Amino acid sequence: MSKPFYVRFEVPPELAEKAYEALRKARESGGKIKKGTNETTKAVDKGLAKLVLIAEDVDPPEIVAHLPLLCEEKKIPYVYVPSKKKLGEAAGIEVQAAAAAIIDPGAAKDLVEEIIKEVEQIKAKAGL
């Protein structure tokens, strides 16, 4: 199955796993996260997000299609993850999440920085 139109670069599975882990770790260590498209959009709009996670299996894709562009505009790093179900679990909710944002990484600070560096390298190779 091809990727939805809003996915601008390929994220390796191990990087996606790191992103889930960073979200989980930030939440569990007293950091601050936002869950869901609306909260994530507001956090990006206000420039509060340190890292945005966007699920690739969102239907309809228009729900999150604005997020990569908004993140680019606000210079906020973002990463794609394959599953909205796993994203919801990592965010600590019992439902799926199309998107999430790490506001304060807490104990996941180093992991978040590592993810941002990897994403920047992937985007540079993709010419973005």
From Swiss-Prot:
InterPro entries: eL8/uL1-like (IPR050257), Ribosomal_eL30-like_sf (IPR029064), Ribosomal_eL8-like_CS (IPR004037), Ribosomal_eL8/eL30/eS12/Gad45 (IPR004038), Ribosomal_eL8/Nhp2 (IPR018492), Ribosomal_eL8_arc (IPR022481). Keywords: Cytoplasm, Ribonucleoprotein, Ribosomal protein, RNA-binding, rRNA-binding, tRNA processing. Belongs to the eukaryotic ribosomal protein eL8 family. The lineage of its organism: Archaea, Thermoproteota, Thermoprotei, Desulfurococcales, Desulfurococcaceae. This is Large ribosomal subunit protein eL8. It is found in: Cytoplasm. It comes from Ignicoccus hospitalis (strain KIN4/I / DSM 18386 / JCM 14125). It comes from the Archaea. Part of the 50S ribosomal subunit. Probably part of the RNase P complex. NCBIfam families: eL8_ribo. The gene is rpl7ae. GO terms for cellular component: cytoplasm; ribonucleoprotein complex; ribosome.
